[in-house]
C-alpha cells in the first residue's frame, strides 16, 4: 500500500491514523480465489473483520464476488445480516447456543453445528417450524477445539435420522498448523477429514483456512475459508508474504524533549539514557493495541529511520528515542509509522512476542480511520472516512 501521509499532519485529535486499503483487500480476496478456481471462496469476518470494520469490509468483499461469510458469534451474524444482501450466507462458527434457534432461523443465519446436542437443537427447531433448516457440520480432525468427536461422528453415521429437518451446506473442519507447511498435523488432519466426509456423501467440504490454501490442491475442496490473508497477514511461514498490505498505522507525536545522560525514562525507569538523548512521546499505548511487551524492544519508523521504544509502553503513550533524526525533524503533530512499508504486521508482532492476528484485532477504536476505496487515490482517502 503506497500511502503518502504528511509527516506533519496532525491526527485531528485522535491518537493516530489507521488507514485501511479496501482495494488491497479486494485484490487479496481475488488472489486467493484464483488459487482454486474450481472452489468457492468465503471470507472470515469475525471480530469486526479482524478489527477493520465488518460492515465496510464485508460489503467490499461481497462486491468482489464473495457470497459466504463466517463470524464467531450470533450477534456478529445478526449485525452483518442487516448490512448484506440476502444472497450472502452467514455462518456462525461457535455454533448453535441455547436460545439462539429462533434468531438464526428468522434471519437466515447458518449455524456451524459442533456437537450432537447442537444437531438435536437445530433438528427440533426445524420440526417445530415444519421446514428444513440449513447448517454446516464441523468435525474435530485433530485440533481438539470445536467439532464432532470421532465417537459422535460414529453415532451420527449410524443414526442419520438425527439430521432430520437439516440441510447440510458444508461439512467442515479447521487446520491447526497450516501456516507451517511441513507440519505432520496437516496431512494427518487431511486424512481424518477425508474419512469423515464419507459419512456425508455428496455434501461439499470446507477445510482450508488461509494457510491451508497454500498447501495445495488436496486441501482446497468446495469452499475455501481465508481470514488473516485477506487482511494482508502472512498465510504461511514459508517464503515471503504474497498478500498485499491492507493496514497502515501512523501515530501522532505529542511532545519532544532532550534529556541528559543518566535520565531514567518511563515507568519503573527501565531505560537509562547513556548520553544526552532526544525523545518523542507518541499518543498511543497498550490501550490502543500496541502491547506492553514492546517495551524497550519495539520501534516506530520515520522516513526509513528506526526509532527505538525507550522504556515501558504506557496505557496511552510510548516514548521513542529519536536521536537518529536531525534535530527538529519531529514536532508536535508529526506522524510516525507503527505499521506500514517499514514495519509489517509480522515485524511488530515478532517484536511483541505475539502473532499478527493479535496485533490486528487489538488495534483500538481511538484511531482516526480512513478507507481507501478500490480505485481511489490515497490522498483522497486520507480525509474521506472517519470510522469509529
Curated annotation (Swiss-Prot):
Listed cofactors: pyridoxal 5'-phosphate
Catalytic activity: L-alanine = D-alanine
Enzyme Commission number(s): 5.1.1.1
PROSITE patterns associated with the record: ALANINE_RACEMASE (PS00395)
Catalytic residue positions: 46 (proton acceptor), 267 (proton acceptor)
Keywords: Isomerase, Pyridoxal phosphate
One GO biological process term: D-alanine biosynthetic process
InterPro entries: Ala_racemase (IPR000821), Ala_racemase/Decarboxylase_C (IPR009006), Ala_racemase_C (IPR011079), Ala_racemase_N (IPR001608), Ala_racemase_pyridoxalP-BS (IPR020622), PLP-binding_barrel (IPR029066)
Residues reported in the UniProt entry to bind substrate: 145, 315
Keyword Isomerase belongs to the record: yes
Cellular compartments per GO CC: cytosol
Molecular-function GO terms, alphabetical: alanine racemase activity; pyridoxal phosphate binding
Pfam families found in the cross-reference section: Ala_racemase_C (PF00842), Ala_racemase_N (PF01168)
Post-translational modification N6-(pyridoxal phosphate)lysine, affected residues: 46
Family membership: Belongs to the alanine racemase family.
Function, as annotated: Isomerizes L-alanine to D-alanine which is then oxidized to pyruvate by DadA.
Name assigned to this protein: Alanine racemase, catabolic
Organism, as annotated: Agrobacterium fabrum (strain C58 / ATCC 33970)
The organism's taxonomic lineage, starting at the top: Bacteria, Pseudomonadati, Pseudomonadota, Alphaproteobacteria, Hyphomicrobiales
Amino acid at each position: 500500500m503506497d500511502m503518502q501521509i504528511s509527516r506533519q499532519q496532525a491526527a485531528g485529535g485522535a491518537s493516530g491514523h489507521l488507514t485501511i486499503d479496501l482495494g488491497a483487500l479486494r485484490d487479496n480476496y481475488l488472489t486467493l480465489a484464483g488459487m482454486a478456481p474450481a472452489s468457492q471462496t468465503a471470507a472470515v469476518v469475525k471480530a469486526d473483520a479482524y478489527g477493520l470494520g465488518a460492515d465496510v469490509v464485508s460489503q467490499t468483499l461481497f462486491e468482489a464476488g464473495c457470497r459466504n461469510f463466517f463470524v464467531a458469534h450470533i450477534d456478529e451474524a445478526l449485525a452483518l445480516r442487516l448490512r448484506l444482501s440476502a444472497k450472502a450466507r452467514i455462518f456462525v462458527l461457535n455454533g448453535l447456543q441455547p436460545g439462539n434457534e429462533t434468531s438464526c432461523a428468522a434471519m437466515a443465519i447458518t449455524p456451524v453445528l459442533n456437537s450432537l446436542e447442537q444437531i438435536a437443537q437445530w433438528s427440533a427447531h426445524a420440526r417445530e417450524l415444519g421446514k428444513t433448516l440449513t447448517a454446516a457440520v464441523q468435525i474435530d480432525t485433530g485440533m481438539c477445539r470445536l467439532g464432532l468427536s470421532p465417537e459422535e461422528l460414529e453415532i451420527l453415521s449410524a443414526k442419520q435420522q438425527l439430521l432430520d429437518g437439516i440441510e447440510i451446506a458444508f461439512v467442515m473442519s479447521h487446520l491447526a498448523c497450516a501456516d507451517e507447511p511441513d507440519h505432520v498435523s496437516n496431512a494427518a488432519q487431511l486424512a481424518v477429514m477425508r474419512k469423515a466426509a464419507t459419512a456425508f456423501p455428496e455434501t461439499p467440504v470446507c477445510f482450508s483456512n488461509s494457510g491451508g490454501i497454500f498447501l495445495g490442491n488436496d486441501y482446497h475442496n468446495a469452499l475455501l475459508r481465508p481470514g488473516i490473508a485477506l487482511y494482508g497477514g502472512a498465510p504461511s511461514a514459508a517464503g515471503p508474504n504474497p498478500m498485499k498490505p491492507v493496514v497502515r498505522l501512523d501515530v501522532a507525536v505529542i511532545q519532544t524533549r532532550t534529556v541528559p545522560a543518566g535520565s531514567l525514562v518511563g515507568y519503573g525507569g527501565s531505560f537509562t539514557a547513556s548520553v544526552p538523548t532526544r525523545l518523542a512521546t507518541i499518543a498511543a499505548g497498550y490501550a490502543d493495541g500496541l502491547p506492553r511487551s514492546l517495551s524497550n524492544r519495539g520501534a516506530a519508523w520515520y522516513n526509513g529511520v528506526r526509532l527505538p521504544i525507550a522504556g515501558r509502553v504506557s496505557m496511552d503513550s510510548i516514548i521513542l528515542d529519536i536521536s537518529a533524526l536531525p534535530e527538529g525533524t519531529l514536532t508536535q503533530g508529526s506522524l510516525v509509522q507503527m505499521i506500514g512499508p517499514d514495519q509489517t504486521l509480522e515485524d511488530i508482532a515478532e517484536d511483541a512476542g505475539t502473532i499478527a492476528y493479535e496485533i490486528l484485532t487489538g488495534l483500538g477504536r481511538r484511531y482516526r480511520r480512513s478507507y481507501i476505496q478500490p480505485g481511489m487515490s490515497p490522498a483522497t482517502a486520507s480525509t474521506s472516512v472517519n470510522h469509529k
